[in-house]
């Protein structure tokens, strides 16, 4: 059973991101476009809560149900919500194209109802040596976010 979801990002960064998963055993395909980003890499994460009542700040930390350290999407030791970076050319829109085998749209660990956050700076993937590297990737301010909702299949 295919599950689809969508996230409308608002803030200084704006855009729409789509999620699709064919079954609980297959990767999630993430695609979309974001505008309002400076040229360079920008951290792109799923945060724990679908609460945007205080803007992006109320979305909580990265979605991390297994108590792991922050890491790269390819790392075994990573938050489930660690989707790495998107790269902006400085022109609108920035394309989002990610395939991830760790996030899911099914079951207790589903990202549906949680928040996508776009950050001002590059995610150092937990390898930057900064005091925030192992928790946030030192990705800077939260410049855009939106709640992931179920979409029509």
Curated annotation (Swiss-Prot):
What biological function has been recorded for the protein in this entry?
Destroys radicals which are normally produced within the cells and which are toxic to biological systems.
Q: What molecular function does GO assign, one term?
A: superoxide dismutase activity
Asked if the Swiss-Prot or TrEMBL record annotates the protein with the keyword Thylakoid, the reply is no
Q: What is this protein called?
A: Superoxide dismutase [Cu-Zn]
Database matches in SUPFAM superfamilies: Cu,Zn superoxide dismutase-like
Write out the residues that bind Zn(2+): 62, 70, 79, 82
- Residues recorded as binding Cu cation, renumbered to this chain, are 45, 47, 62, 119
> Which co-factors does it depend on?
Cu cation; Zn(2+)
Question: How the protein assembles, per its UniProt entry?
Answer: Homodimer.
Keyword Oxidoreductase (UniProt): yes
Q: Which cysteines are joined by disulfide bonds?
A: 56-145
- InterPro entries for the chain: SOD-like_Cu/Zn_dom_sf, SOD_Cu/Zn_/chaperone, SOD_Cu/Zn_BS, SOD_Cu_Zn_dom
């Amino acid at each position: 059973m295919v599950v689809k979801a969508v996230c409308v990002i608002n803030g200084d960064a704006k855009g729409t991101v789509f999620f699709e998963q064919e079954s609980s055993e297959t990767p999630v395909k993430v695609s979309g476009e974001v505008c309002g980003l400076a040229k360079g890499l920008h951290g792109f994460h799923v945060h724990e809560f679908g609460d945007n009542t205080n803007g992006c700040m109320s979305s909580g930390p990265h979605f991390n149900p297994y108590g792991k350290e922050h890491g790269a999407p390819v790392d075994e030791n990573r938050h489930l919500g660690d989707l790495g970076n998107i790269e902006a050319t400085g022109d609108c829109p920035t394309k989002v194209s990610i395939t991830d085998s760790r996030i899911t749209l099914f079951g207790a660990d589903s990202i549906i109802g949680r928040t996508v956050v776009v950050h001002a700076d590059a995610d150092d993937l937990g390898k930057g040596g900064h005091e925030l590297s192992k928790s946030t990737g030192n990705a800077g301010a939260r410049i855009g976010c939106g709640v992931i909702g179920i979409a029509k299949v």
